[in-house]
């Protein structure tokens, strides 16, 4: 049993390491960057540009007059939402020089393997 798997094959480390999807659930806080509250009438457009942390919301509270119309026309960009910048180093230490948990699960005889081979079991154990 090389590594933590059977016959040199690793035991698997979850969906994040196998190329499958990694589901994430989030909940946004209430928007605090732009607020318009008044009993008056607003006409025209409000333009906001820049990087916003959330997509945003629109809310109408109160009563509309019985005569006339009331509406909200709300849009946010072109629909292309993505991460523009991430923090962190971007590179991790993974090369063990053959004396531990090295690159690609290769332990070089001194890892967690069996018979001079092995590794952590997350990759091929030879």
UniProtKB/Swiss-Prot annotation:
UniProt-annotated stretches for the region Central domain: 18-86
The organism's place on the tree of life at top rank: Eukaryota
Chain intervals for the UniProt region annotation (Right arm (Gly-rich tandem repeats)): 87-126
GO biological process: chorion-containing eggshell formation
Record-level Gene Ontology MF annotations: structural constituent of egg chorion
Region (Left arm): 1-17
Keyword terms: Repeat
InterPro entries: Chorion
Signal sequence extent: none
One term under GO cellular component: egg chorion
Purpose of the protein: This protein is one of many from the eggshell of the silk moth.
Sequence similarity: Belongs to the chorion protein family.
Name of the featured protein: Chorion class B protein M1768
Highest classification ranks of the organism: Eukaryota, Metazoa, Ecdysozoa, Arthropoda, Hexapoda
